[in-house]
Amino acid sequence: MALPEFSMRQLLEAGAHFGHQTHRWNPKMDKYIFGARSNIHIIDLSQSIPLLHQALVKVREVAAGGGRILFVGTKRQASEPIATAAKRCAQYYVNHRWLGGTLTNWRTVSNSIARLRELESVLGGEGQGRSKKELLQLTRERDKLELSLGGIKDMGGIPDLMFVIDTNKEAIAIQEARKLNIPVIAILDTNCNPDGITYPIPGNDDAARAIQLYCDLMADAILDGLAAGQAASGVDLGASEAPVEPTLARELAPEAPAPEAPAEEAPAAEAAPAAEAAPAAEAAPAEASSEEQAG
Protein backbone atom coordinates (compact mmCIF):
# COMPACT_ATOMS: atom_id res chain seq x y z
CA MET A 1 0.00 0.00 0.00
CA ALA A 2 0.97 3.64 -0.35
CA LEU A 3 -0.16 7.03 0.84
CA PRO A 4 -3.61 8.04 -0.45
CA GLU A 5 -3.44 10.07 -3.64
CA PHE A 6 -5.20 13.37 -4.18
CA SER A 7 -5.10 16.09 -6.79
CA MET A 8 -5.62 19.80 -7.25
CA ARG A 9 -8.85 18.98 -9.10
CA GLN A 10 -10.21 17.05 -6.11
CA LEU A 11 -9.51 19.96 -3.79
CA LEU A 12 -11.08 22.43 -6.21
CA GLU A 13 -14.19 20.30 -6.70
CA ALA A 14 -14.55 20.03 -2.92
CA GLY A 15 -14.33 23.82 -2.60
CA ALA A 16 -11.20 23.66 -0.46
CA HIS A 17 -9.93 26.90 -1.99
CA PHE A 18 -12.76 29.12 -0.76
CA GLY A 19 -11.94 31.14 2.32
CA HIS A 20 -14.07 33.59 4.29
CA GLN A 21 -15.15 37.11 3.40
CA THR A 22 -12.20 39.45 3.13
CA HIS A 23 -13.21 41.42 6.25
CA ARG A 24 -13.27 38.21 8.33
CA TRP A 25 -9.67 37.20 7.85
CA ASN A 26 -6.70 36.65 10.12
CA PRO A 27 -3.68 38.61 8.82
CA LYS A 28 -1.41 35.74 9.91
CA MET A 29 -2.94 33.69 7.09
CA ASP A 30 -1.85 36.22 4.48
CA LYS A 31 0.97 34.03 3.12
CA TYR A 32 -1.51 31.26 2.33
CA ILE A 33 -3.97 33.49 0.45
CA PHE A 34 -3.84 33.57 -3.36
CA GLY A 35 -6.13 36.57 -3.76
CA ALA A 36 -9.76 37.65 -3.47
CA ARG A 37 -12.82 37.22 -5.67
CA SER A 38 -16.19 38.84 -4.99
CA ASN A 39 -14.92 39.81 -1.52
CA ILE A 40 -14.06 36.17 -0.74
CA HIS A 41 -10.48 35.19 -0.06
CA ILE A 42 -9.10 32.41 -2.25
CA ILE A 43 -6.68 29.99 -0.59
CA ASP A 44 -3.47 29.14 -2.46
CA LEU A 45 -3.87 25.40 -3.03
CA SER A 46 -0.39 25.18 -4.53
CA GLN A 47 0.82 25.59 -0.95
CA SER A 48 -1.91 23.41 0.55
CA ILE A 49 -0.99 20.34 -1.51
CA PRO A 50 2.60 19.84 -0.22
CA LEU A 51 1.51 20.70 3.33
CA LEU A 52 -1.32 18.16 3.15
CA HIS A 53 1.09 15.55 1.83
CA GLN A 54 3.50 16.29 4.68
CA ALA A 55 0.67 15.83 7.20
CA LEU A 56 -0.35 12.51 5.64
CA VAL A 57 3.23 11.27 5.87
CA LYS A 58 3.26 12.13 9.58
CA VAL A 59 -0.08 10.42 10.18
CA ARG A 60 1.14 7.28 8.44
CA GLU A 61 4.36 7.31 10.45
CA VAL A 62 2.54 7.59 13.80
CA ALA A 63 0.06 4.86 12.86
CA ALA A 64 2.84 2.53 11.70
CA GLY A 65 4.53 2.98 15.07
CA GLY A 66 1.37 2.01 16.93
CA GLY A 67 0.60 5.56 18.07
CA ARG A 68 -2.83 6.94 18.97
CA ILE A 69 -4.40 9.58 16.73
CA LEU A 70 -7.25 11.77 17.95
CA PHE A 71 -9.71 13.34 15.48
CA VAL A 72 -11.35 16.53 16.77
CA GLY A 73 -14.23 18.32 15.07
CA THR A 74 -17.29 19.42 17.04
CA LYS A 75 -18.93 21.77 14.54
CA ARG A 76 -22.08 20.50 12.85
CA GLN A 77 -20.52 19.89 9.42
CA ALA A 78 -17.55 18.01 10.87
CA SER A 79 -19.23 15.91 13.55
CA GLU A 80 -20.29 12.93 11.43
CA PRO A 81 -17.28 12.79 9.04
CA ILE A 82 -14.87 12.97 11.99
CA ALA A 83 -16.55 10.08 13.82
CA THR A 84 -16.93 7.95 10.69
CA ALA A 85 -13.31 8.40 9.61
CA ALA A 86 -11.92 7.70 13.09
CA LYS A 87 -13.97 4.53 13.46
CA ARG A 88 -12.97 3.33 10.00
CA CYS A 89 -9.27 3.42 10.89
CA ALA A 90 -9.69 2.26 14.52
CA GLN A 91 -8.70 5.60 16.03
CA TYR A 92 -10.34 8.02 18.48
CA TYR A 93 -12.48 11.13 18.19
CA VAL A 94 -14.27 13.98 19.92
CA ASN A 95 -17.17 15.24 17.82
CA HIS A 96 -19.68 16.65 20.28
CA ARG A 97 -18.17 19.01 22.85
CA TRP A 98 -14.62 19.28 24.08
CA LEU A 99 -14.52 18.93 27.85
CA GLY A 100 -11.89 21.20 29.39
CA GLY A 101 -9.06 19.06 30.73
CA THR A 102 -9.73 16.12 28.42
CA LEU A 103 -5.97 15.86 27.85
CA THR A 104 -4.39 17.91 30.63
CA ASN A 105 -6.52 16.25 33.31
CA TRP A 106 -6.62 12.76 31.87
CA ARG A 107 -6.83 11.08 35.28
CA THR A 108 -10.18 12.73 36.03
CA VAL A 109 -11.41 11.96 32.52
CA SER A 110 -10.40 8.33 33.06
CA ASN A 111 -12.66 8.23 36.12
CA SER A 112 -15.54 9.50 33.99
CA ILE A 113 -14.78 6.83 31.39
CA ALA A 114 -14.84 4.20 34.14
CA ARG A 115 -18.25 5.51 35.20
CA LEU A 116 -19.45 5.26 31.59
CA ARG A 117 -18.34 1.63 31.40
CA GLU A 118 -20.07 0.92 34.71
CA LEU A 119 -23.31 2.39 33.41
CA GLU A 120 -23.03 0.41 30.18
CA SER A 121 -22.58 -2.76 32.21
CA VAL A 122 -25.56 -2.01 34.47
CA LEU A 123 -27.88 -1.06 31.63
CA GLY A 124 -26.59 -3.89 29.45
CA GLY A 125 -27.81 -6.29 32.10
CA GLU A 126 -31.26 -4.71 31.80
CA GLY A 127 -30.84 -3.06 35.22
CA GLN A 128 -32.24 -5.90 37.24
CA GLY A 129 -33.63 -4.86 40.60
CA ARG A 130 -33.88 -1.15 39.67
CA SER A 131 -36.97 0.98 39.29
CA LYS A 132 -37.99 2.53 35.97
CA LYS A 133 -37.19 5.99 37.33
CA GLU A 134 -33.70 4.94 38.37
CA LEU A 135 -33.09 3.26 35.01
CA LEU A 136 -34.18 6.43 33.22
CA GLN A 137 -31.73 8.52 35.26
CA LEU A 138 -28.90 6.08 34.59
CA THR A 139 -29.71 6.05 30.87
CA ARG A 140 -29.59 9.84 30.70
CA GLU A 141 -26.27 9.90 32.55
CA ARG A 142 -24.85 7.27 30.21
CA ASP A 143 -26.03 9.11 27.08
CA LYS A 144 -24.49 12.37 28.30
CA LEU A 145 -21.14 10.71 29.00
CA GLU A 146 -21.27 8.83 25.69
CA LEU A 147 -21.64 12.07 23.74
CA SER A 148 -18.51 13.56 25.29
CA LEU A 149 -16.38 10.49 25.94
CA GLY A 150 -17.68 7.74 23.65
CA GLY A 151 -15.02 8.37 21.03
CA ILE A 152 -12.10 8.25 23.50
CA LYS A 153 -13.26 5.63 26.02
CA ASP A 154 -10.89 3.05 24.52
CA MET A 155 -7.95 5.43 23.99
CA GLY A 156 -6.16 4.38 27.19
CA GLY A 157 -4.00 7.50 27.44
CA ILE A 158 -3.22 10.80 25.77
CA PRO A 159 -2.84 10.68 21.96
CA ASP A 160 0.41 10.89 20.03
CA LEU A 161 -1.08 13.12 17.33
CA MET A 162 -4.18 15.28 16.94
CA PHE A 163 -6.09 16.14 13.76
CA VAL A 164 -8.37 19.18 14.02
CA ILE A 165 -11.08 20.75 11.89
CA ASP A 166 -11.56 24.48 12.70
CA THR A 167 -8.86 25.78 15.04
CA ASN A 168 -11.07 28.64 16.23
CA LYS A 169 -13.78 26.35 17.55
CA GLU A 170 -11.29 23.82 18.94
CA ALA A 171 -8.94 26.39 20.51
CA ILE A 172 -9.09 24.75 23.96
CA ALA A 173 -8.22 21.33 22.56
CA ILE A 174 -5.24 22.82 20.72
CA GLN A 175 -4.05 24.64 23.85
CA GLU A 176 -4.12 21.39 25.81
CA ALA A 177 -2.23 19.56 23.07
CA ARG A 178 0.44 22.27 23.01
CA LYS A 179 0.89 22.04 26.79
CA LEU A 180 1.55 18.32 26.45
CA ASN A 181 3.72 18.72 23.32
CA ILE A 182 1.29 16.71 21.22
CA PRO A 183 1.76 17.51 17.50
CA VAL A 184 -1.31 19.07 15.88
CA ILE A 185 -2.47 18.72 12.28
CA ALA A 186 -5.12 21.32 11.49
CA ILE A 187 -7.17 22.63 8.59
CA LEU A 188 -6.67 26.39 8.52
CA ASP A 189 -9.28 28.64 6.95
CA THR A 190 -8.55 32.29 6.22
CA ASN A 191 -9.95 33.36 9.60
CA CYS A 192 -7.72 30.99 11.61
CA ASN A 193 -4.54 31.53 13.59
CA PRO A 194 -1.72 29.27 12.35
CA ASP A 195 0.44 29.83 15.44
CA GLY A 196 1.20 26.65 17.35
CA ILE A 197 -0.03 24.32 14.61
CA THR A 198 2.66 21.74 13.91
CA TYR A 199 1.28 20.68 10.52
CA PRO A 200 -0.89 23.47 9.04
CA ILE A 201 -3.09 22.70 6.02
CA PRO A 202 -4.63 25.83 4.46
CA GLY A 203 -8.16 25.00 3.33
CA ASN A 204 -11.87 25.57 3.66
CA ASP A 205 -12.98 24.23 7.05
CA ASP A 206 -16.72 24.83 6.51
CA ALA A 207 -17.65 23.04 3.27
CA ALA A 208 -18.99 19.54 3.93
CA ARG A 209 -17.31 18.06 0.84
CA ALA A 210 -13.94 19.51 1.79
CA ILE A 211 -14.20 18.21 5.36
CA GLN A 212 -15.16 14.76 4.06
CA LEU A 213 -12.13 14.76 1.75
CA TYR A 214 -9.71 15.72 4.54
CA CYS A 215 -11.12 13.03 6.85
CA ASP A 216 -11.03 10.34 4.17
CA LEU A 217 -7.40 11.12 3.32
CA MET A 218 -6.38 11.00 6.99
CA ALA A 219 -8.18 7.69 7.56
CA ASP A 220 -6.62 6.15 4.43
CA ALA A 221 -3.13 7.27 5.51
CA ILE A 222 -3.68 5.73 8.96
CA LEU A 223 -4.85 2.44 7.46
CA ASP A 224 -1.77 2.41 5.25
CA GLY A 225 0.41 3.06 8.30
CA LEU A 226 -1.25 0.27 10.27
CA ALA A 227 -0.69 -2.16 7.40
CA ALA A 228 2.95 -1.09 7.13
CA GLY A 229 3.43 -1.53 10.87
CA GLN A 230 1.98 -5.04 10.78
CA ALA A 231 4.09 -5.95 7.77
CA ALA A 232 7.24 -4.71 9.53
CA SER A 233 6.47 -6.88 12.55
CA GLY A 234 5.83 -9.91 10.35
CA VAL A 235 2.12 -10.11 11.13
CA ASP A 236 -0.41 -10.62 8.35
CA LEU A 237 -3.73 -9.33 9.67
CA GLY A 238 -5.62 -10.73 6.70
CA ALA A 239 -4.39 -14.24 7.37
CA SER A 240 -4.25 -14.10 11.17
CA GLU A 241 -7.30 -16.32 11.57
CA ALA A 242 -6.71 -18.54 8.54
CA PRO A 243 -4.36 -21.10 10.18
CA VAL A 244 -7.00 -22.02 12.75
CA GLU A 245 -9.60 -23.31 10.32
CA PRO A 246 -7.28 -25.40 8.11
CA THR A 247 -5.92 -27.03 11.28
CA LEU A 248 -9.40 -28.09 12.25
CA ALA A 249 -9.99 -29.30 8.72
CA ARG A 250 -6.87 -31.49 8.83
CA GLU A 251 -7.86 -32.94 12.20
CA LEU A 252 -11.37 -33.71 11.06
CA ALA A 253 -10.53 -34.97 7.56
CA PRO A 254 -9.59 -38.56 8.56
CA GLU A 255 -12.81 -38.91 10.52
CA ALA A 256 -15.03 -37.63 7.74
CA PRO A 257 -15.20 -40.88 5.67
CA ALA A 258 -15.96 -43.02 8.77
CA PRO A 259 -19.72 -42.40 8.89
CA GLU A 260 -20.17 -43.21 5.19
CA ALA A 261 -20.25 -47.05 5.65
CA PRO A 262 -22.92 -47.27 8.36
CA ALA A 263 -24.90 -44.56 6.64
CA GLU A 264 -26.10 -47.11 4.03
CA GLU A 265 -27.41 -49.56 6.65
CA ALA A 266 -28.69 -47.13 9.25
CA PRO A 267 -32.24 -45.78 9.01
CA ALA A 268 -32.55 -42.25 7.68
CA ALA A 269 -33.75 -40.95 11.03
CA GLU A 270 -30.57 -42.13 12.75
CA ALA A 271 -28.21 -40.86 10.06
CA ALA A 272 -29.36 -37.25 10.36
CA PRO A 273 -27.88 -36.50 13.80
CA ALA A 274 -24.55 -38.19 13.10
CA ALA A 275 -22.11 -35.95 15.00
CA GLU A 276 -19.04 -37.06 13.10
CA ALA A 277 -20.46 -36.23 9.67
CA ALA A 278 -21.00 -32.54 10.49
CA PRO A 279 -17.33 -31.43 10.48
CA ALA A 280 -17.01 -32.42 6.81
CA ALA A 281 -19.53 -29.72 5.93
CA GLU A 282 -17.74 -27.26 8.21
CA ALA A 283 -14.37 -27.85 6.58
CA ALA A 284 -15.57 -26.46 3.23
CA PRO A 285 -16.12 -22.85 4.41
CA ALA A 286 -12.61 -22.84 5.86
CA GLU A 287 -11.18 -23.14 2.34
CA ALA A 288 -13.56 -20.55 0.97
CA SER A 289 -12.66 -18.22 3.81
CA SER A 290 -8.96 -18.65 3.14
CA GLU A 291 -9.51 -17.90 -0.55
CA GLU A 292 -11.45 -14.76 0.29
CA GLN A 293 -8.72 -13.58 2.64
CA ALA A 294 -6.04 -14.33 0.08
CA GLY A 295 -8.00 -12.38 -2.52
From Swiss-Prot:
GO terms for cellular component: cytosolic small ribosomal subunit. It holds the Pfam family Ribosomal_S2. SUPFAM superfamilies: Ribosomal protein S2 (SSF52313). Residues 264-288 have a biased composition (Low complexity). Gene3D superfamilies: Glucose-6-phosphate isomerase like protein, domain 1 (3.40.50.10490), Helix hairpin bin (1.10.287.610). Keywords: Ribonucleoprotein, Ribosomal protein. GO terms for biological process: translation. Residues 242-295 are annotated as: Disordered. One of its GO terms (molecular function) is structural constituent of ribosome. Belongs to the universal ribosomal protein uS2 family. This is Small ribosomal subunit protein uS2. It comes from Phenylobacterium zucineum (strain HLK1). The gene is rpsB.
